[in-house]
């Protein structure tokens, strides 16, 4: 989406030339003119080719004028918004997220500028783009903003980048209006530690082993039982790992996920206070889930966690409060729950599993994945299992017994 590798069109090439070094007011005016006069195809292409974060930072409003940044943002977020396709709209939002978004309309590019305030022209432009996008295009825009596999996602946008409560309320109201008819699509939500890979309490696998079949399971939950044609990429991780101002935790978590096969996913982090106990962890994750579900009222959700850190409690809370939207809760057992405990949790709608083949069988039983999807998870789990470098023969045999037991639950192919 951002910084396309395709050859630059003449408009993009000229704008890049103008952006080299200091950009004066005449050069800024030429940039605005080039984008304003470009035909629809060229405009969309240019917005996907240019580094818009740099562009928005180069074009300024001045104390005595001209207000070129205001002109540029109004051009893109209002005057020509109807000409823009979803990728170009997402590129604008992304570019604005990567720069300052908390300044007043007095602007901020001259000595003696006012202190940052909420509701500046960048925040208003972001709001304009979302309010000017409807129906399935709005869903596509939100998903495109989420797709960067970095800290600049929808959650960050609405909790950190936009500070004006009035603008935030407008966007949430718009999301609710446009997403009032749920699509039937599911966004899979997952924990990371001892759910995606072994890291804290699970000694059945070597440390930091990605569980066999987990990636295939996420994909099948995303596809759904009808094998929907919409692109994959709805996966979101809800983790207790604490958030902090620098974004380092989120960046490192994204790096770890990419290294282990997750190409695109959003991450919703916890807090230091959320680490006090399992109940606090569950409450913080629930808070993040509720915020996220308001961004995506058109979607349903599934939750995949583990039995070690409050994820089962979170699943119960989700099912109790949002039974129509939470379609399945799957808990990976890493603490050897008793049969009685498993039965009690199942009675509350929480499905406990030992392998991702078992998780897929439970999801298939709930009508969340297809027959062919179930088979794909089984195949992926076997391949993943064979690739693990085990700590001991005993460790491998114990894990193999659980995998074989769950593979026997699958229908013959």
What are the language-model segments listed below?
Residues 199-201, 246-252, 311-318, 339-342:
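A short acidic (Asp/Glu
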Residues 218-226, 285-299, 318:
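Short, basic/hydrophobic alpha-helical segments
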Residues 216-228, 324-361:
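A short, conserved beta-to-alpha structural element at the edge of catalytic cores
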Residues 154-266:
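Glycine- and small hydrophobic-enriched segments that form the cores of compact globular domains
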Residues 7-190, 394-395, 412:
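Non-catalytic pre-domain segments flanking phosphatase-related domains
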Residues 24, 352-413:
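Long, compositionally biased intrinsically disordered regions
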Residues 297-308:
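Conserved Lys-Pro-Asp/Glu-containing loop-to-beta segment of HAD-superfamily phosphomonoesterases
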Residues 248-296:
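A charged nuclease-like catalytic/ligand-binding cleft shared by nucleic-acid processing domains
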């Amino acid at each position: 989406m951002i910084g396309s590798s395709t050859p630059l069109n003449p408009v993009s090439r000229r704008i890049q030339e103008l952006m080299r070094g200091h950009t004066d007011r005449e050069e800024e005016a030429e940039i605005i003119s080039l984008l304003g006069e470009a035909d629809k195809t060229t405009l969309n292409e240019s917005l996907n080719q240019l580094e818009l974060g740099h562009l928005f930072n180069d074009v300024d409003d001045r104390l005595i004028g001209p207000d070129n940044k205001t002109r540029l943002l109004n051009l893109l977020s209002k005057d020509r918004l109807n000409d823009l396709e979803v990728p170009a709209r997402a590129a604008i939002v992304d570019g604005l997220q990567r720069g300052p978004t908390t300044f007043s309309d007095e602007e901020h590019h001259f000595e003696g500028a006012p202190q940052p305030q909420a509701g500046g022209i960048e925040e208003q432009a972001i709001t304009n783009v979302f309010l000017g996008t409807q129906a399935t295009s709005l869903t596509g825009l939100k998903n495109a903003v989420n797709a960067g596999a970095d800290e600049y996602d929808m959650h960050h946008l609405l909790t950190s980048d936009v500070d004006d409560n009035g603008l935030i309320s407008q966007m949430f109201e718009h999301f609710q209006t446009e997403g009032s008819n749920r699509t039937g699509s599911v966004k899979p939500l997952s924990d990371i530690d001892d759910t995606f890979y072994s890291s804290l309490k699970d000694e059945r696998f070597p440390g930091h082993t990605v569980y066999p079949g987990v990636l295939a399971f996420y994909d099948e939950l995303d596809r759904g039982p009808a094998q929907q044609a919409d692109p994959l990429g709805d996966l979101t991780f809800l983790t207790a790992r604490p958030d902090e101002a620098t974004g380092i935790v989120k960046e490192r978590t994204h790096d770890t996920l990419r290294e282990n096969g997750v190409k695109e996913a959003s991450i919703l982090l916890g807090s230091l206070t959320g680490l006090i106990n399992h109940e606090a962890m569950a409450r913080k994750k629930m808070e993040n889930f509720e915020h996220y579900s308001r961004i995506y009222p058109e979607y349903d959700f599934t939750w995949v966690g583990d039995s070690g850190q409050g994820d089962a409690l979170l699943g119960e809370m989700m099912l109790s409060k949002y039974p129509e939207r939470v379609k399945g809760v799957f808990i990976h057992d890493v603490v050897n729950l008793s049969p009685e405990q498993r039965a009690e949790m199942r009675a509350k709608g929480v499905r406990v599993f030992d392998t991702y083949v078992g998780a897929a069988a439970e999801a298939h039983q709930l009508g969340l994945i297809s027959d062919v999807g179930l088979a794909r998870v089984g195949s992926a789990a076997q391949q993943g299992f064979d690739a693990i470098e085990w700590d001991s023969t005993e460790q491998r045999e114990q894990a193999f017994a659980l995998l074989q037991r769950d593979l026997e639950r699958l229908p013959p192919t």
